[in-house]
Swiss-Prot record:
Any one GO MF annotation of this record: myo-inosose-2 dehydratase activity
Database matches in InterPro entries: IolE (IPR023952), IolE/MocC (IPR030823), IolE/XylAMocC-like (IPR050312), Xyl_isomerase-like_sf (IPR036237), Xyl_isomerase-like_TIM-brl (IPR013022)
Annotated source species: Bacillus cereus (strain AH820)
Record protein name field: Inosose dehydratase
Reactions catalysed, as given in the entry: scyllo-inosose = 3D-3,5/4-trihydroxycyclohexane-1,2-dione + H2O
Gene3D superfamilies per UniProt: Divalent-metal-dependent TIM barrel enzymes (3.20.20.150)
Organism domain of life: Bacteria
Keyword terms, alphabetized: Cobalt, Lyase, Manganese
Amino acid sequence: MFKENTIKLGIAPIAWTNDDMPELGAENTFEQCISEMALAGFNGSEVGNKYPRNTVVLKKSLELRNLEIASAWFSTFLTTKPIEETVEEFIKHRDFLHDMGAKVIVVSEQGHSIQGLMDVPLFKNKPVFTEEEWDKLADGLHHLGKLAQEKGLHIVYHHHMGTGVQTTAEIEKLMDMTDPELVSLLFDTGHLVFSGEEPLYILKKYLSRIKHVHLKDIRQEVVDIVKENELSFLQAVKNGAFTVPGDGVIGFDKVFTILANSDYKGWFVVEAEQDPALANPFEYALKARKFIQEKAGL
């Protein structure tokens, strides 16, 4: 289905230890995490909070297991803080990822975000940017995009539940306001379906701008509970809203077909944050790997 040497398969460490709720998977070590990723048949991962920041140490640990770093999340605060604060941290993050050989930097605006707040209802309290904040976001992303390109990297914007860029309309607005040469898109199946969007619409419309893909599935019965009981994003995660591809309600056949027939070249990263005490990370990594092999031939 996919052209040879176009796709690398990664998996996010958030299934082993949750960055937003470190108590989930606190017992799982960095070495266990990356060893199980390799055993499950993945080529790389994104960066978690237990990963060494010393690039020499990190490279050695990964090379022993034939793994690479695909990318790492970066929180921007362009709508709520002076741009200099975001830029200073971004440059450090960019240089770290450049040293690790990554090609894309995952960015997500966290100004007014409720994704990390345990008791704030996800759908009821979703943030909405003002026009002034949209302008700050677009201008700031252009600046970060130029900084990334100084080292041969691209920024990929992660639309995300509980943030100001979550819905189809918000993704379209961001894409309309930004330069395709400077700002690319991260396509995340799970966040789109969770929000009630049509993922294939976004995939088709912005195919040429998508430079990173997160493969995530949804347990619809949990999403329904989240809406009915006005739960937060973190409560949704703890209750199992997300799972690996093939274990939920999302149909991936068309997603894979569209991407296979495109010029997409890069990473597919399985990102399915759930409680590792309830969903063994290694077992679910194997499930995901088997599903991707069967459905995408990768």
